[in-house]
Amino acid sequence: PSLTLGCGSWGGNSVSENVGVKHLINIKTVAERRENMLWFRTPEKVYFKKGCMPVALDELGTVMNKKKAFIVTDSFLYKNGYVAPIEEKLDEMGIQHTCFFEVAPDPTLQCAQKGVDQMRAFEPDTIIALGGGSAMDAAKIMWVMYEHPEANFEDMAMDFMDIRKRVFTFPKMGEKAYFVAIPTSSGTGSEVTPFAIITDAETGVKWPIADYALLPNMAIVDVDNMMTQPKGLTSASGIDVMTHAIEAYVSIMATDYTDGLAMKAVKMVFENLPSAYDNGANDPKAREEMANASCMAGMAF
């Protein structure tokens, strides 16, 4: 009990009798506070270590018996041979494949629509996103449009306080295609995040989409795809890793599980970004540590 100004208890402030001591002793009832269940979610499979990509992709044929793969990337990566090792591995396993390489920075809904038109004609059972955040974001949106043509982006982008308690129920993913994400820069962490941003070029509206249904099924973090990053990209993406890790650590939704990943990622950035910037491919260890830091910060984020 506590002595308070006013009278009455249980939230009341008026009585039909003379105010006495019993009315000043206001016994409050407080509801029991229960915290939400928390969870830590990542892609089902996360492969890492230099040279891991061919081994990881081997599962598509030997374990999953996939038949058709649709590769999403940008023109630079396609023209500079980054797609070739993937195509060679798919050919080796007898998996048919085609490639959409028209993704631009800040991908648009119109670009995604063009890609998904090709996707529907090809009817793949696997989608492979190769690139930075833009390519992976575009591929995630294409995945949604391929599996659920009726999807409404205005509904999917609806604000929410808790990703588990949103008004809009995100459609179930993975019934048509298995999603593989392969980063070529150590920065966005999109290969392990449930986020995608798409812009409507006609209206200028950006749709930020967030739902655990957008988590890739497999992430392949092979530093062989990141060795030749230019200095500008190395520095910018390295700071991106740092901001993801710090934001994850100070978030009100931070947990013991995310804190460990976030702090380790920060430590790895401080220890390896300068050398990755100065020495590039001449310091493969620093490159690999930055690739891992990016993925870990993405998990924490």
Segments predicted by a language model, with ranges:
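Structural motif
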Residues: 2-4, 8, 22, 45, ...
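Carboxylate- and glycine-rich phosphate/diphosphate-binding segment that chelates Mg2+/Mn2+
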Residues: 193-301
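ATP/NTP phosphate-donor binding region
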Residues: 37-126
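Structural signal for hydrophobic packing residues in well-ordered secondary-structure cores
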Residues: 7, 25-35, 60, 64, ...
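Electropositive phosphate-/nucleotide-binding environments in soluble metabolic enzymes
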Residues: 14-22, 46-50, 54, 63, ...
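C-terminal segments
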Residues: 1-37
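Glycine/threonine-rich beta-strand-loop-alpha-helix active-site module
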Residues: 110-224
